[in-house]
Amino acid sequence: MNTATGVIALLVLATVIGFIEAENTRADLQGGFESYEGEAAEKIFRRSPVCTRTDQPCPYDQDCCSGSCTLKKNENGNLVKRCD
């Protein structure tokens, strides 16, 4: 076997291994957070905001901490929804 054949064989092997790894990754992504266990999952969900704070934009009618969202003028004079 010469050098060119060896290089081609290594490239084919790397490609096959890449496809196997891609299949494993796809299975993990389809499961969502099922692959996370215990503390790792808690850290992910702990960082997510519970409510939108005062004077922050509230698009898509998200829940504000105060419980209300009203139209207010921004620095450009445009009306935007903001949490009270």
UniProtKB/Swiss-Prot annotation:
Disulfide bonds join 51-65, 58-69, 64-83. GO terms for biological process: defense response. Residues 1-22 form the signal peptide. Its main location: secreted. GO terms for cellular component: extracellular region. Residues 23-45 form a propeptide. One of its GO terms (molecular function) is calcium channel inhibitor activity. It is found in: Secreted. Keywords: Calcium channel impairing toxin, Cleavage on pair of basic residues, Disulfide bond, Ion channel impairing toxin, Knottin, Secreted, Signal, Toxin, Voltage-gated calcium channel impairing toxin. Expressed by the venom gland. The record marks 57, 74, 82 as: Critical for insecticidal activity. Belongs to the neurotoxin 08 (Shiva) family. 01 (omega toxin) subfamily. The presence of a 'disulfide through disulfide knot' structurally defines this protein as a knottin. Inhibits insect, but not mammalian, voltage-gated calcium channels (Cav). This is Omega-hexatoxin-Hmo1c. It comes from Hadronyche modesta (Victorian funnel-web spider).
